[in-house]
């Protein structure tokens, strides 16, 4: 029987890092299922889901622990629970504005208050084309519960968007985005 494992990985970015990890998983009969990995600053960070034969799991865990000597921290845990059945609507939230502390905090406060689940979040700071000022950009994939009113959520987000001086758009993933006012 295969055991599903979810891992987090962090360490100084270097060539061959992912290959080392993939090699260890393969050497222990593991199957690499899905991952999200990137360089953040000078660090490499990732999340990974694998299946490994139950009898090879302890051996794999020891091999992953040995990566610490090469400056890579790996935390692995068994993912015994079944994946939750998705309910509600998938929605994409995009945020763009001048960078400042608290943008994600304020946006996620509204989302949590409406019972919205953040399924995926990616963000970055980039230089504005003309001014060179720092812009904050985020893309957030949301799972809206059936009880969540999209219009009400949009209204709440628009209220804080003007305070945060950001533009937001909220779109059903199956429909065209409707830009929010700033």
Q: What does each model-found stretch correspond to?
A:
Residues 1-182:
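A conserved regulatory-domain signal marking ACT and ACT-like small-molecule sensing domains
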């Amino acid at each position: 029987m295969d055991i599903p494992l979810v891992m987090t990985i962090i360490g100084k970015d270097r060539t061959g890092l992912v290959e080392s990890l993939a090699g260890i998983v393969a050497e222990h009969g593991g199957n690499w299922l899905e991952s999200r990995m990137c360089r953040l600053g000078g660090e490499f960070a990732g999340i990974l889901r694998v299946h490994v034969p139950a009898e090879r799991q302890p051996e794999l865990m020891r091999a992953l622990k040995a990566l610490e000597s090469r400056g890579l921290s790996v935390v692995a845990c068994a993912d015994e629970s079944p994946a939750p059945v998705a309910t509600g609507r998938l929605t994409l939230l995009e945020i763009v504005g001048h960078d400042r502390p608290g943008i994600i905090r304020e946006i996620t406060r509204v989302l949590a208050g409406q019972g919205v689940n953040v399924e995926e979040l990616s963000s970055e700071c980039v230089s504005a084309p003309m001014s060179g000022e720092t812009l904050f950009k985020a893309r957030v994939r949301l799972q809206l519960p059936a009880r969540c009113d999209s219009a009400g959520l949009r209204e709440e987000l628009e209220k804080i968007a003007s305070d945060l001086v950001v533009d937001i758009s909220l779109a059903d993933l199956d429909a065209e985005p409707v830009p929010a006012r700033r």
